[in-house]
């Protein structure tokens, strides 16, 4: 099916979603499975950049959700000491052998988890981390230890997600658009970007920066307050602003624009990508 045909079939299935079960056959099942396969291969994305703006393929997100209704829970093996798990989403790596790994071209350290329908591009390094379904991780990115890439999140090229970073998903609670980290960004340890916020290209978030839709993002130089988006080339740290009753509330502060000194501290190490 073409993408336009898939979209029409997914939208029809979504309207009848209460009737969809693991026993469902026909066009609805075929469309959902084809969409999940396209997401898994990276030929389709939940969100794609068109010029300076991001376009969200809402129907692809709906297909991810419909996939939960089409599959029964089953035992997944491979746990410590012969343990198992109980889930309805397969691993991206299920049944992979040497040929599939070589063709994929990324590195996956033991104990990383990637669920089927997430795309991982060539040159990516996955430390013991979690990448949820529908996500897209582009070339040369490092997903460091205990980092989480949420459902349908979009991670650009040559991004570094430091240890314990959380990139929010869109499925629960439902968000209109995915969280997006554009190319060449560095996200410091234990930082969180959630609720469909966008970190624009080349930005650096220091350790422990938390950004959601209601987080004030303050430009220290101009005093401008913005929400939901970090401008390109920003260096951002955690801060606070005065509020009612003499209490300071958390905010994220743009302290400067990325310069040569910042790049030298946050550049990726090509030796780790070989």
From Swiss-Prot:
Show the catalytic activity.
(S)-2,3,4,5-tetrahydrodipicolinate + succinyl-CoA + H2O = (S)-2-succinylamino-6-oxoheptanedioate + CoA
Q: Where in the cell is it found?
A: Cytoplasm
- Give the protein's recorded name: 2,3,4,5-tetrahydropyridine-2,6-dicarboxylate N-succinyltransferase
Does this UniProt record's set of keywords contain Cytoplasm?
Answer: yes
Q: Say which family it is in.
A: Belongs to the transferase hexapeptide repeat family.
> Where on this chain does substrate bind?
107, 144
- Residues annotated as coiled-coil are none
Superkingdom = Bacteria
* E.C. designation(s): 2.3.1.117
Q: Which UniProt keywords apply?
A: Acyltransferase, Amino-acid biosynthesis, Cytoplasm, Diaminopimelate biosynthesis, Lysine biosynthesis, Repeat, Transferase
GO annotation, cellular component aspect = cytoplasm
Gene name, per UniProt, is dapD
Q: Which Pfam families match?
A: Hexapep_2 (PF14602), THDPS_N_2 (PF14805)
Record pathway: Amino-acid biosynthesis; L-lysine biosynthesis via DAP pathway; LL-2,6-diaminopimelate from (S)-tetrahydrodipicolinate (succinylase route): step 1/3
Entry-linked PROSITE patterns: HEXAPEP_TRANSFERASES (PS00101)
* GO MF term set: 2,3,4,5-tetrahydropyridine-2,6-dicarboxylate N-succinyltransferase activity; nucleotidyltransferase activity
Q: What class of enzyme is it?
A: transferase
Tell me which species this is from: Cereibacter sphaeroides (strain ATCC 17025 / ATH 2.4.3)
Q: Which GO terms describe its biological process?
A: diaminopimelate biosynthetic process; lysine biosynthetic process via diaminopimelate
Q: Which HAMAP family does the record match to this protein?
A: DapD
Oligomer and partners: Homotrimer.
